[in-house]
A protein has these predicted regions:
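Structural recognition of the beta-strand scaffold that forms the well-ordered cores
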Residues: 82, 173-174
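A glycine-rich beta-turn/hairpin centered on an aromatic-Pro dipeptide
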Residues: 174-199
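Hydrophobic, well-ordered secondary-structure elements that form the walls
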Residues: 176, 207, 251
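Generic recognition of long tandem-repeat/solenoid scaffolds
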Residues: 41-44, 219-221, 251-253
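C-terminal hydrophobic structural anchor segments
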Residues: 199-240
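Short intrinsically disordered coil segments
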Residues: 56-61, 96-99, 188-190, 223-224, ...
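Acidic/polar, low-complexity extended loops/arms that serve as protein-protein interfaces
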Residues: 1-168, 184, 195-200, 206-208, ...
Length: 271
């Protein structure tokens, strides 16, 4: 029996990476503010001043716009991985193992940020995602898992009725993989017509897909009105000391970010 002298050949260069949700919001052209420190307040006029025509010789009326603010406050998240001495010895290449872990932690942070931007609860240190922003437009579908084309298009009208101008560069639909598949087979005007989602677009607006979106939900928004506040950069620290008595090396990844919207009415979420 020769099995005792057959060794495993570990091919870390051919590592099969974990499957993670697609990143969406950062590809939707949001407004990104970098190098932030502490709480950041962005002044906002809501509602603005109002003008009106008057007859000759009549004084115009006073208008009192309301000044509000949009606030960003640091939300920190991260993870760590412990690499055992045995693993590093068995691979014979601690650098490759460390790089593998660094890359996975980086992807993990990106996934966490995307989840926060879409469905973050705003509680317990979490940022507030689009689905939970107070004041966004909401739309109810007759059949939650199978909206009609008219219902999907009606989301545009809800946003535009609030004086928001949608455009093909910064306005996107975002939905789940399952809903996206449904939209590809949802006829616009009955049998024989074209479909709601064709070639990655709905009525000229790009469609992004993410498993971070809540089941049966469709989001439409002008993402230039979505603000991503970045506090510093992603920090990855190699700590050989905390578990030095066992020869274990700890890799820690941390990053701080927050999200806000200029105008909640720039978004519509199906409920």
């Amino acid at each position: 029996n020769s099995s005792a002298i057959v060794f495993d050949d570990l091919r870390y260069s051919s590592l099969i990476e974990s499957l993670r949700p697609f990143s969406t919001v950062l590809s939707a052209n949001p407004t990104i503010l970098t190098g932030l420190n502490g709480n950041v307040s962005i002044p906002k006029i809501n509602p603005g001043s109002t003008s009106a025509f008057v007859t000759e010789g009549t004084a115009v009326s006073q208008s009192d716009p309301t000044l509000e603010s949009v606030t960003l406050s640091q939300k920190t998240g991260g993870a760590y991985v412990d690499i055992s001495r045995t693993l590093m010895m068995n691979t014979g290449d601690s650098f490759s193992v460390e790089n593998m872990v660094r890359n996975d932690l980086s992807r993990s942070l990106a996934t966490m940020f995307d989840a926060g931007s879409v469905s973050g609860s705003g509680a317990g240190g979490n940022p507030t995602g689009i689905e939970n922003v107070t004041g966004v437009n909401t739309s109810s579908f007759t059949s939650a898992g199978a909206p009609s084309y008219a219902e999907i298009i009606a989301m545009q009208g809800l946003i535009e009725s609030d004086n928001v101008s949608l455009d093909g560069d910064t306005s996107f639909y975002i939905t789940t993989p399952a809903m996206n598949s449904t939209l590809k087979t949802t006829a616009k005007n009955g049998a024989g017509s074209s479909f709601a989602q064709e070639d990655g677009f709905i009525d000229g607006y790009p469609v992004l897909v993410s498993s971070q979106v809540t089941s049966n939900t469709i989001i439409l928004g002008k993402f230039s009105d979505f603000i991503v506040g970045v506090y510093g950069g992603m920090e990855i620290t190699v700590d050989p000391y905390s578990l030095s008595t066992t020869g274990t090396q700890r890799i820690v990844a941390l990053a701080s970010i927050d999200f806000a919207v200029r105008h909640p009415v720039s978004f519509c979420v199906s409920v």
